[in-house]
Amino acid sequence: MGKPFATYREWQPGSEYHGLSAERITLNEKTLWKGGPNTAKGAEYYWNVNKQSSGVLKEIRQAFLDGDSKKAGYLTQENFNGLGAYEEKDETPFRFGAFTTMGELYVETGLSEINMSNYRRILSLDSAMAVVQFYKDGIRYQRKYFISYPDSVMVMKFTADKGGKQNLVLSYCPNNEAKSHLEADGNDGLVYTGVLNNNGMKFAFRIKAIHKGGTLKAENDRIIVKDADEVVFLLTADTDYKMNFAPDFKDPKAYVGNDPSQTTLAMMDNALKKGYDELYRNHEADYTALFNRVRFEINPEIGTPNLPTYKRLASYKKGVPDYQLEQLYYQFGRYLLIASSRPGNMPANLQGLWHNNTDGPWRVDYHNNINIQMNYWPACPTNLSECTWPLIDFIRSLVKPGEKTAQAYFNARGWTASISANIFGFTAPLSSKSMAWNLNPTVGPWLATHIWEYYDYTRDTKFLKEIGYELIKSSAQFAVDHLWHKPDGTYTAAPSTSPEHGPVDEGVTFAHAVVREILLDAIQASKVLGTDAKERKQWENVLTKLVPYRIGRYGQLLEWSTDIDDPKDEHRHVNHLFGLHPGHTISPVTTPELAQAARVVLEHRGDGATGWSMGWKLNQWARLQDGNHAYKLYGNLLKNGTLDNLWDTHAPFQIDGNFGGTAGITEMLLQSHMGFIQLLPALPDAWANGSISGICAKGNFEVSISWKEGQLEKAIIHSKSGIPCNVRYGDKTLKFKTVKGKKYEITLKGDKLAVL
């Protein structure tokens, strides 16, 4: 891929605050982070580890053997955390850092709301363009915003249907945690350079204005436009951050790259040469090539209310059906992923990339105990596999630092991470002694399962051989080494916790489910490549001796090693159902008894909780193939976990729920995690008629499905790798060989599936 981030930065007018008198635009660049090795003299930064941790493992495990779980918990909380020096006294991470904003632009228009009418704000999912339009004194005004990924530029266009009506003043409000300098760049632009106080990270942006009619001048810190017919603003932005897959731990500048004042200049020169029309054509072609792959319709015979989205959502919350709102939410999730995760940049964080604070919620970091993983659940199934690349590169950047964490805490081979990560390879726990959330060593293997997922959907053997397999293998090595081989011959994860829930335990179900998943992935990957037969046997041996799933006193899947589950517990995390989703070791088809135990858990946990939690439960009910209950969760997500602009809310805004919702809808209509393609596995009664085209199944199949009166009408399966295809619809099955590039139509003929 070359040098990451040199050619493109994904920022958005993502937090636009529209008004007649002024437009306020928050600038977000995902590599603008506080923290990192520059704050800790290089090598010290990577040793945010309690170096005696692995030495205490034997004592902790002996305490479990002795039945003294209290002692085991105490020893764990005293030794399996990070160092307090990495956080300031107010508990705001210092060396860990936080995603921060570049500041805000203001475009003052001189207009008031007097005699204003027909004000509309539009986000077109078809073109990824934001539009503001209104009438003022009989004149139609319009403002357009888009970002061209191929050209690394943000574009804003101000027009009116009468000449000479653009009187604008563009100004900037800086990030107050940086030393900054803003000056005119010629007579038509501004150039800003900044340095974060915390770590010395450099950042810059440039603005150029192009006008028709009237006058334009740049002076000091403003661009002033008078009596113009039309104004186009171009903005380029960058930081000096450089992703590093093999950082030199002695170098405090391991993540420092090119001068952003120069990279933004090159971007701007390119944009100016092309002009507005070409920039828009490039943007539209690039975006639609991804977004238009999938089409989705629910009950198309029912019309769409002609109301603003927030009013439609309000009506939906009152129980008024709106199937087009449901399909809009689905496609909005795909739009958000395209906008926040493109090759050559960081992955989507807790808020995707949209935030307007110097210290956002949870530092707007990468939470590895479900949140970043949930962000990528819809990527491959909704035909956006390219959008997985930022996650893949992020995982690659964690490996070398993660090897230190694996060694320090478990004396293990391979690599792992902890609950929170930043863009500088931070893989250790934070300093908190609250082990319920701070101890989670299997999040590294959970991340690594996405590597196999990407391969399984794309069947890109070159990727698996050159990049993917080593990530999976080294993660599997950690998974094995961190386990406790007990005197009775079983393997268990001790110490471990069920993320954000409950005590330190000698083997929580979640940890075992993740280990089971990564070992199965490693076994399959080694077979595909015909390598590591000896190590594969070890993985297979550990799987046979890993503590199995267990069912508790009220029929529930156990969360911990003992039956302490509370049937009244409605906690938001449903960690012990990892094997149901996103894993694939529990299914009503292959393991019906375990699936029933998972159902009991979900029934007791309830149908509420945070937005992202409802998104997860939606996927789990879909995996249980209960379409009506999955639909209930989807409705709850929209009614109780969605803001007026369709962002997910925790509260506060957290983007993972959007992605979980989109993924869950796909799971309702198509599943392929059990070794076959299952059509309409969880179709709800409410969606009597509909169609979806362009979604993907494992094995590199692209699938389109239509249904009528709740029954399959037909499916089109496009085989992109030419492997055998195994299809299931209800209790009907069909197997057939395929040819690469050929499409196959599947229909019902009598009581059987047939291929045409």
Give the location of each predicted region.
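Active-site-proximal binding-pocket segments
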Residues: 346, 358, 367-376, 383-470, ...
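Residue-level signal for beta-strand positions within conserved beta-sheet cores that form or flank
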Residues: 166, 489, 675
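Active-site neighborhood of glycoside hydrolase catalytic domains
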Residues: 443-447, 451-469, 473-475, 487-505, ...
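A generic, residue-level signal for flexible/boundary positions that often mark functional hotspots
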Residues: 217, 348, 457, 673, ...
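C-terminal capping/lid segments that line or modulate ligand- or cofactor-binding pockets
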Residues: 2-26, 95, 101, 366-387, ...
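Solvent-exposed, charged/polar functional surfaces in cytosolic regulatory/catalytic domains
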Residues: 286, 290, 478, 521
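Aromatic-residue-lined binding/catalytic grooves and analogous aromatic/hydrophobic interfacial grooves
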Residues: 1-435, 453, 473, 486, ...
